[in-house]
Amino acid sequence: LYNLAEVLDSYHLPRSPQLAVITNDGGVGIIAADALEECGGELSPLSDDLKGRLGRLLPRHWLADNPIDIMADADTERYSDTVRACLAAGEIDGVLVIYTPRSASDPVDVANAVISLYRGTQKPVLGVCMGGKRAAKGRRRLLANSVPAYATPEEAIKTYLYMYRYRRNIELLYETPSEVVMPDSPFKEVIKAAIQECTEVGELQLEGKYVLVLLQHYGV
């Protein structure tokens, strides 16, 4: 597993629990969407502008929705173009890139493309390489270049939401607390009179009958 402490120390932290899921397998995309919802996250809505851009990059029969299914025949260029388009979209706060063995591309090549895009953005990018030894090479490549990478969508999504909650907690710590307005005491004038009388007779602190007056008014 990717070192969570290193992930949280990164400046690639999400601004929201919304996530764009890019996959070459529609079924795996549905699994990722379900896991995201179960963990309290959301699929990022795709603007018309982003849909139009993706429509020019992807096969004509793509579903124009998130998860973004780039199809089983996706090559490295299609992966790269899709991730780049999502990172450039203002409504996207984070991207999960899923590679499955159905892909026509090499997992290491896909990993290299993701690494290049990750270095040019402050948005979080996470990778999932599913499959045997071949896919593991892609994961290792991502991890070696500080890109969080996992064997399953569920692991990646849990980490993404940890990252979001961590950022949110940091923001809350730095928020200026609102001023607490204390209600006026109903015995304010009594207290002022007792203090004034005490000072007039040369007393430097409340003693004796003055203390008793205050305690009686507060029911002590």
Features from the language model and the residues they span:
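Peripheral docking tails and interdomain loops at the edges
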Residues: Y2-T23, G27-V28, A33-L43, N112-Y218
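Short glycine-cluster motifs
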Residues: R15-T100
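Flexible, active-site-proximal loop/turn residues at the rims of small-molecule/cofactor binding pockets
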Residues: L1, P101
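Flexible, glycine-rich phosphate/dinucleotide-binding loops
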Residues: G52, A104, R134
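Glycine/threonine-rich flexible loop motifs
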Residues: S103-A111
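Residues at or immediately preceding the N-termini of alpha-helices
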Residues: T76, P107, P153-E154
